[in-house]
UniProtKB/Swiss-Prot annotation:
Keywords: Chromatin regulator, Chromosome, DNA damage, DNA repair, DNA-binding, Nucleus. It comes from Mus musculus. Component of the MMS22L-TONSL complex, a complex at least composed of MMS22L and TONSL/NFKBIL2. Interacts with RAD51; interaction is direct. The gene is Mms22l. The keyword Ubl conjugation does not apply. GO terms for biological process: chromatin organization; double-strand break repair via homologous recombination; protein localization to chromatin; replication fork processing. This is Protein MMS22-like.
Amino acid sequence: MDGCSAASTFLTDSLELELGTEWCKPPCFSCAFDNREGKFSGESYLASGALKRLILNLDPLPTNFEEDTVELFGFQWVTETALVYSCRELFHLFRQQIFNLESLVQVSCDFGKIATLHAKADSIRQQCVVFLHYIKVFIFRCLKVQEAESHSRPAHPYEALEAQLPSMLVDELRGLLLYIGHLAALPSVTVGAFVNQNQMKLFPPSWHLLHLYLDTHWLVLEILHILGEKLKQVVYGRQFIGQAGDNLTNVSLFEEHCEHLFCDLICLSLNRFDKVMPSEALLISHCPCSCVKELWVLLIHLLDHRRKWSVADSFWNWLNKLLRTLFEKSSDQRRSSVSLTQAKDPLGFSWWISVHVASLYQIDRHGVSDKMKQMESNWSFIEELLKRSVTVQDSILEEQLRMHLHCCLTLCDFWEPNISVVTILWEYYSKNLNSSFSISWLPLKGLTNIIKSPLSMLTLVRNCCSDKQDPDLYKSSSSYIIFLCILAKVVKKAMRTSGPHPWKQVKGRIYSKFHQKRMEELTEVGLQNFFSLFLLLAAVAEIEDVASHVLDLLRFLRPASMSSHGALVWKGQMAFLLMYAQKNLDIGVWAEKLSCEFQEKAKEFLVSKNDEMVQRHALWTLLCIYIDGVQEVFETSSCLYPSHEHLLNDGFSMLLPACRESELRTVLNFLQAVLARIRSVHQQLCQELQRENVDLTVQSSLSAKERPLAAVAGALWRHFFSFLKSQRMTQVVPLSQLADAAADFTLLAVDMPNTAPPDLQPQPVISIIQLFGWDDIIWPQVVARYLSHLLQNSTVYEALSQSSCVSSQSLTIRSWVRCVLQMHIKHLSDPDLLIDVNPEQAVEKEYMEQLAEMTRLLFTLSEVKSVFSKAQIEQLPSPDDPKQALIQFLEAVGVTYRTLQTFSDKSAMVTKSLEYLGEVLKYIKPYLGKKVSSAGLQLTYGIMGILVKSWAHIFATSKAQKLLFRIIDCLLLPHTVLQQDKELPGPMLTAIQKTLPLYLQGICIVCCQSQNPNAYLNQLLRNVIEQYIGRFLPTSPCVSDLGQHPVLLALRNPASVPSMTPLRKHTVHAIRKSYLEFKGSSPPPRLASVLAFVLQLFKDTEMGACDLELLLPGILKCLVLVNEPQVKKLATENLQCMVQTCQVGSEGGPATQLTSLFRQFIQDYGMQYSYQVYSILETVATLNQHVVIQLIPTLTQSLKDSELKWGLGRNIAQREAYSRLLSGLGQVGQGEKQRLEK
């Protein structure tokens, strides 16, 4: 069967396909397949080619009923005579089979019986369908037309019976139709079979019965049509009369059956329409299944075919005639032959079924959808529906009107244009322009009561003009918007087919409704509808004519309307300006009008007071409309005209100073968009000029386009750049936008340098970078963002490399150094409570990201790469940590300097290094004031400490030493440190404690590297040590707590520092001078902690004889004069360390120096503190007898001098104490002891 149906699809309209003799299953209605693609079953009348054969008057089934006999209802019949001899019997059997099928419907259809019932029902249906097809074939092949002369001769009995067959068929077909009744009158269980879905393809008897009824209704029409085509005359029935009481004929039966079939189909559709929401009207079909849809298509093709060759009604006439009866007030007024159910909403139903039936015209004779097919229209009836829809007396609701117009819009898409439709609708909407056309319970998606912007106005118009219809149009648009869609579609179609005449008709109708009184009556909603209408007309027709008329009409608006609806009027006018730009037309007229109005409002905004919030808000609303609209104009225009310059007038110069921060953001966003567009257009022109084979005419044209571009650029320099320049040191302008706008102007100067103002000439790029990138007084947030924009633009640095500014990279590096150092400058505060906060957390994430980006780009500079390369650092630092990257860069600079050999190279490197730093102390000065930032101080002291240490060799030069002196004075020896009554702030002291070793080591290296001794530098180093030894001493004199003392950390002689001798020397001097100096017999403060520090100093460093000479007298003095146990203990430990440094037997050097120191000690304290002296020397003797033995003469002489002084003879107690000392000194001591006893 599939092969036959497929083949029949390709039958030509003039030839009948010669098929084999294989029996093909006759076509029938079937929805037992997946029809989601909209295709019909291969068994259908359309797909099988049955409809085409019917219309072309071809053999209905050329491969069937070819045998001598045919099986009908289980019996064998002679094919060529069965219908003549047994017509009534066959129809009786047919009705009996229908009865049998109806009986099966009554049987309970459970799952166990479904297969059996399906098989029986399907067999009955097939027998009935085969019989009806047999009638068609018999009429076409076997029925002979009775000629006139045959009535004069005696007829053969068969001929006599054959002559009666047509009348008998008419009677039997009428009887069959009466027997099966109307589809609409079927029991609900049978009608419910339409929606039966069964994946197993097993259907209940009700499904088969329903589809057999459909087959019967359609095949009766086929039989009557074939009968009429065969006989070419009217056939009268003998048993029945027609509905009008006249004789029944094949023609009247056909018409009667058509009417009944239409009624049935309409009733089935009415049942579905009652469940359809207005918003779903176009989504839900009127057909319960594909078989009903096919029946509609069959009727369309058959009735329209008959209309071509006879006076019969077309399909639309049949449908219109019956739908009109729905509007009759009572069933009494309807024709008795029409049995239609009373519709709840006849108007809505008529729209709904009309649009769905119209779509079926796209389906051809084979059941294939062809959207390009010319469709038969039904505008006369649709016009009637439109008039009913917009009749005020009927009070049609908006939700209903939307559905009606949505259907109308779809029909406009199907059919040829009809200006009358627009005329009818405009008559209604012209009277209701002030209506919002809204549905209270349904908010419009994407559409507020008042359009938000000019661009949204154009977007609305563009959507209305789109050929693609929005499936959600009902919910997203009002009925007025749908009317605009209809207007656009009709006018566009009509102008394509008929030229400008339809547009002139529409224009006349619409223009005539607007006059001064009407314009004055428009509310805000009305004005919005007014602009939407005329924007749409401008989009589809003559924009200049429409725009000119709009300008004339706007003059009719009263001043009160302009003040209350000014924003909407501005939006509408700006929308026209945008449309001109989109169509690449000269915007001169609109630009001049709008720019003048903008200038006036900007002046009012400038002089308005800050407390006049309502007025300012109203003015700002208008100004925003202008700004947004002009931005769209520039972004939309493919080329710029001289009139574009008018849009950038003095109004901006007045507006900018009056703006607050949020308002400035809006204006600067506009500025950046316009700058980007100008540069884009300029680059396009340059590319076109650079093409090969450009003739002089084209060059002249491109040059002409360049002139208005330069004029627009000049306007931006005048009105915007001067303001940015004046605000670059303030925080009035948002910093990020200030940087972005300045970068955009820099790029504009690169592309179009001649447009820059005179004060930036002759090198505008360098001048702007100097203002916003290299100037130390600009906020670092601005500099970082600004330079990041430029560093990633190769064109900028090409311009810089060609300029006379040879140190551009050095200046950029200097700016980067400042940006890193000042990353915490915005977080200064009086009470700094963030000492332990992670420094990175104290910086805005945005600025850290910007710094990281700037660092990444900076490391691409050739100068930076060269520094790292010479320092033999292959892996560049990670830009994600700008602080660490700066540290590594500074260290690399120091390493690079140390690798240089010649004096000239070193001198140049020192100069370059100082350029990198610039006024570095000014960068960090904010952290050192009254307002502090712990994170900022930690950053400052850390990086500057690294700088001092890693650049020590550079600071050893005369060029750089001044900076080192200033660093020491500013960071380590500020005035607060030198004032005894003032304490350093806690965060500063913490930062110094962490970084002091770096400074001390660096200064020490400088001292070692200096070619000439620098007394001032040495004095500074000693002052630093003096100030901070005591400040960082622990509260308890515990040696273990002194391990992290910054001075001791510095003295631990790291491998990177060759010699710590100067540092140790100055440390010892500082201790001797400031921490071991007694005032009379009063010990210095915190003596125990100082002694602990000295003890740790001896352990950590290699002390020399000169160090002993300075420290030992003070230690000995402590042992003599202080009785505090902790002091004595620590002093003793110090004494032991000092003695241990002088090994026994050493000749000269430390041992001799030590002996000399003790001899002086004995002379100073021997007479008054003899017992303490002897005790101290006993301790020394346990470590180094040799030293004490050398002191025996001095001790003996001191003893005698003491006794002589007191004049009391021998001092027995003192001599005993001295004897104890001598007892521990071996033979020498014993000998001295004996001499004393004599």
